[in-house]
């Protein structure tokens, strides 16, 4: 979600875009889960973002819609930590497909399958409606 202004601080959200989410796992969990995806997620340990996350509520709805009751082994707030635990055989985890190339380069994980309909949204947050910083202006123009 975009940032919310408060009475003490006025902030503005500038959309940078969004990305579909995929399920990733170590080579071991890829072997177990790839062929029968998404039903196979019920038979592997899952690492999920905490319930504070917008993506988590989307993931919960997606899993319920698929009729899956997976084994949740950890709820992790930080996406980098989620990736770290997922790359060490602790379980399967969700991550943005837009970052797949970098994720595969950094970690020994594989894409198990896409989580259709679940998206991560990205925003630049500023204290002014008009962004003044030249680099941020360039990023916003490219979106």
Segments from the language model and where they lie:
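Secondary-structure junction motif
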Residues: 30-33, 44-66, 132-140
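Active-site-adjacent beta-strand anchor residues
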Residues: 48-49, 75, 93, 125
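Short beta-strand->loop
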Residues: 11-22, 105-119
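Acidic, Gly/Pro-rich loop/turn segments at junctions of secondary structure
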Residues: 1-44, 98-99
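A late-sequence structural motif
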Residues: 30-32, 110-143
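Hydrophobic hinge/microswitch elements
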Residues: 54-110
